[in-house]
């Protein structure tokens, strides 16, 4: 999700001694390799699909066994008072780097990631847009994942962050606005470990509709085309071509939605519209490039739109609340 600045420190402070003690109790088998095979990058799922130790976004979230037996981690994740999406402990090995990239898949269209550093050093640097920061242990940070960003662990030990993905309620975004507009840094709310506290963890049950709503599809397409149109280096004819290709999808999707909604009878028609659009993409993935972050249009279309628009296997669960 886009923010109005690269980084934003939230007014929270957590006890890293207790967090570190819980992390130290983990066993090597808890740490999973990065799904893309990134060297030096491992993670422990804390909130995941059905609470299973795996990656993935598309399914009902639940606390994993690791989170359930880590009371302070559970208190920290719950303390934001928000509905939580996929969340993890992320470990970056000494000298390792997360290469520059942009988070543009559908998950990030409406979500932000809260970082809570647990084990870190001043030589761990987070770069986002034109800025860089060191996120100190126990703090809480947001960053704009639509900007190009990277992380460098320049220290001699593992860097471990708790990361919590949320869409955020009005209360949360009101807090963000208050912090952004403040002339002085707000005193942080300290959350000490409380053995007696019962944590209520709210998790996403429906991270995406089985069929993307026409209004959401129109918003994604409009924002993407506006971003590409703002780039003076893009070809006008190609802008026109992609405008027509994508808005043809929006209009026909809305028509089909009006007839079928989430009904099984409509799936083949939705699939045909997605296939038609996929076939219409130019071979060059960077035939058009966004002005905001210099990403090619095709990967964004594929990840944010085509791969996310139809999850028909979850239709019954979405309507009835059970699979």
Residue ranges and their predicted role:
Residues 82-84, 93, 109-113, 121:
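Short connector loops at helix/strand junctions that flank enzyme active sites
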Residues 89-107:
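Conserved short histidine dyad/triad with adjacent acidic residue
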Residues 117-137:
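A short beta-strand-loop-beta hairpin characteristic of the jelly-roll/cupin
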Residues 163-235:
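Charged, amphipathic alpha-helical linkers/stalks
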């Amino acid at each position: 999700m886009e923010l109005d600045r690269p980084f934003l420190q939230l007014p929270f402070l957590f006890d890293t001694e207790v967090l570190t003690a819980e992390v130290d109790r983990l066993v090597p088998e808890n740490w999973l390799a990065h799904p893309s095979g990134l060297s030096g990058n491992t993670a422990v799922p804390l909130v995941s699909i059905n609470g299973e130790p795996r990656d993935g976004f598309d399914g009902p979230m639940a606390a994993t066994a690791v989170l359930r037996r880590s009371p302070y981690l559970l208190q920290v994740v719950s303390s934001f008072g928000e509905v939580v999406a996929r969340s993890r402990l992320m470990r970056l090995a000494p000298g390792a780097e997360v290469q520059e990239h942009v988070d543009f898949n559908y998950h990030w269209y409406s979500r932000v990631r809260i970082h809570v550093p647990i084990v870190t050093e001043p030589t761990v640097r987070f770069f986002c847009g034109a800025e860089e920061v060191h996120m100190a242990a126990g703090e809480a940070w947001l960053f704009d994942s639509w900007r190009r960003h990277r992380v460098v662990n320049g220290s001699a030990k593992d860097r471990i962050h708790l990361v919590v993905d949320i869409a955020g309620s009005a209360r949360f975004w009101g807090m963000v606005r208050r912090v952004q507009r403040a002339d002085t840094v707000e005193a942080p709310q300290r959350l000490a470990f409380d053995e007696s506290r019962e944590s209520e963890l709210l998790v996403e049950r429906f991270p995406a509709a089985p069929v993307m709503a026409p209004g959401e599809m129109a918003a994604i397409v409009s924002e993407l085309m506006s971003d590409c149109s703002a780039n003076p280096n893009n070809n006008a004819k190609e802008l026109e071509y992609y405008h027509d290709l994508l808005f043809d999808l929006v209009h026909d999707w809305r028509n089909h939605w009006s007839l079928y909604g989430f009904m099984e009878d409509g799936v083949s028609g939705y699939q045909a519209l997605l296939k038609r659009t996929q076939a219409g993409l130019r071979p060059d993935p960077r035939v058009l490039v966004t002005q905001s972050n210099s990403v090619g249009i095709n990967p964004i279309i594929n990840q944010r739109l085509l791969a996310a628009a139809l999850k028909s296997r979850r239709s019954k669960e979405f309507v009835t609340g059970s699979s």
